[in-house]
């Protein structure tokens, strides 16, 4: 049985090094899809590069944890900036859901302005769309706009509440991450998905060249290792040998 594999590189627009890494992993590797940060410092650079790589499917990485929002978000920002304190607000059940709804719509419109088309799918920076308070907002929005949504089903307790017309892959994995990146790890992710009987799988990745912005990230040099693995000819062969077809969320 042929299975669909979506290799999605997060953080398009984070920095020029990140952008170049994603394009390299698409052009000479197995990355088929990316998600863009519309408030990223290098988003205009990402847009420019994407024009020369039409095969790269581009979704939107909804941002609530970094940089400046596009709308006024007094309930979520500090000194006008987003940050990881969103986890504390979620634990306290104090998230400004109306502000988040408006920001989602604004980032979506900004994406269309930048790229000239709808995103192929939605996900979020640091997976905040999987918060139980935020997930229904994003799921409903994706269904209404007719675009797919990354769903990590492990923490999802309200799967029965999904909109009937919401599209997603059957499986999602964030396991290709950390200090032990290798071809063997990537293939283990595929084998685990096959054993679960999933007909389609998204694997998240972060290939990049290291620049000053990436150096400031807690996840820095493994991004280079990811890039090396994702552009390996032997990995591409092993994926095909396992019965996977590379594609994007347009195929689900």
From Swiss-Prot:
Family: Belongs to the YdjC deacetylase family. ChbG subfamily.
Organism: Escherichia coli O157:H7
Keywords (A to Z) from UniProt: Carbohydrate metabolism, Chitin degradation, Cytoplasm, Hydrolase, Magnesium, Metal-binding, Polysaccharide degradation
Molecular function in Gene Ontology: chitin disaccharide deacetylase activity; deacetylase activity; metal ion binding
Reactions mediated catalytically: N,N'-diacetylchitobiose + H2O = N-acetyl-beta-D-glucosaminyl-(1->4)-D-glucosamine + acetate; diacetylchitobiose-6'-phosphate + H2O = N'-monoacetylchitobiose-6'-phosphate + acetate
EC number assigned by the record: 3.5.1.105
Name the UniProt record assigns to this protein: Chitooligosaccharide deacetylase
Function per UniProt: Involved in the degradation of chitin. ChbG is essential for growth on the acetylated chitooligosaccharides chitobiose and chitotriose but is dispensable for growth on cellobiose and chitosan dimer, the deacetylated form of chitobiose. Deacetylation of chitobiose-6-P and chitotriose-6-P is necessary for both the activation of the chb promoter by the regulatory protein ChbR and the hydrolysis of phosphorylated beta-glucosides by the phospho-beta-glucosidase ChbF.
Subcellular location: Cytoplasm
Cofactor needs: Mg(2+)
Entry's Gene Ontology BP terms: chitin catabolic process; diacetylchitobiose catabolic process; polysaccharide catabolic process
Source taxon at top rank: Bacteria
Chain positions recorded as Mg(2+) binding sites: 125
Gene coding for it: chbG
GO cellular component, one term: cytoplasm
Broad EC category: hydrolase
Cytoplasm listed as a keyword: yes
